Amino acid sequence: MRRSLRSRLATLVLLGVGALPGLPAVAADVDSSLFAQLRAAAPAANPDVLGLAARAAECARAQGLLDGFGHLAVIDYSLPSTQPRLWVFDLQRRRLLFEELVAHGRNTGAGLAERFSNVEGSRMSSIGLYQTADTYYGSNGYSLRLRGLDPGFNDNALARAIVMHGAPYVSQAIADRLGRLGRSWGCPAVREEVARTVIDTLKGGALLFAYYPDRKWLAESPFFKCAGAGATSPSAVVATAAPLPPNQG
């Protein structure tokens, strides 16, 4: 039942097209060229999620938070951890660079992500828009710091040491054996074989959009409230959907 509600909400949050008869379109103001670019490059990704990622990225740029960006990473935490749910795009060359497995936090859920937190010590993942920062070597090896841009949802990421890193518990073999990936303490961990390349691609100011159909975030994130104030916001669409289990932490 939970998955069906989650799928329903993801379907409702559309860009440019109403999800069901009588429901308004979400974002007439989205840069359709960016959305089209992402959708063409990653046909396996949920177009609704890509549309929201495009909206958030353009909003961040419109607000003057970024001078420009060449790469965008999208994580769809509504998918099980056994499926590729991280996409990394080269926006200059208009192509998909990576389609990868990515782990979520230990207390976020088992195979499915269900709970998110911005609190130190929660060992949960955080949703929202991030900007990448510098790299360093830590207890998990080569790692990429992430600066959370969504107040109340991920803006404690630096303090929590939420970083991208490689991990031995992220692999197709682990997914096949356990029916899920291993879990981090909240970090978006990737396969060790690709970690350095992915990190070097994203370091130094790229955007990372971590999605989950959380009604509060969709209603409150400043990155869904940019140009085209008359356009229907995600919160207006979410209000018509069946409730999801509450996030904790």
Which role does the model predict for each range below?
Residues 1-5:
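N-terminal secretory signal peptides that target proteins for export/translocation
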Residues 10-21:
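Bacterial N-terminal signal peptides
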